Amino acid sequence: MAHQSLYRAYRPQSFRDVRGQEQVTGALREEIKAGKVGHAYLFAGSRGLGKTSVARIFAQELKVSDKDLYEIDAASHNSVEDIRSLNENVHTLPFGSPYKFYILDEAHMLSKGAWNAFLKTLEEPPAHAIFVLATTELSKVPDTVQSRCQVFEFRKPSREGLTKLIDAVAKEEGYTLAPGVDDLVALLADGS
């Protein structure tokens, strides 16, 4: 059996598995339950808090297939041409899902021209398109974009919550931690 890093092995697979972001997962669950899902979301918070994982789970809960899920690294695809290509793609119908779901990771890295090219699509998206913009630097996302999104701020989980998670993972992996090690790891993890 190949070794798998712990962050991959214990990545949340459902909203229930997400720790410390109940304000986000609860709101998204309610939207799904009410059938009132928006077209644009902005997930903001420091690295390692689960923004991309929650976006993937959100897509999964909306029954979006892999063929209709687009993950775009905006740090390396941040040009006007990249966004124009996305704008063209968004207007084609989904393959078999109710939605085409776009995750733009590191969205704050888009160029000014790219933001301008994206704004029209964000203002008047097709009914089958959902966008999740994930950022570690909310202040770099233009106000005109923020105002068109539902903004969710991801918070660092409590040290106590992280300590419990560390204990559970250690137990699952067959390790016994020396007293205080779980708290030290939680402190050094700084919320992620």
Q: What residue spans do the PLM features occupy?
A:
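P-loop/Walker A NTP-binding region and its immediately flanking N-terminal helices
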Residues: 1-151, 160-161, 169, 179
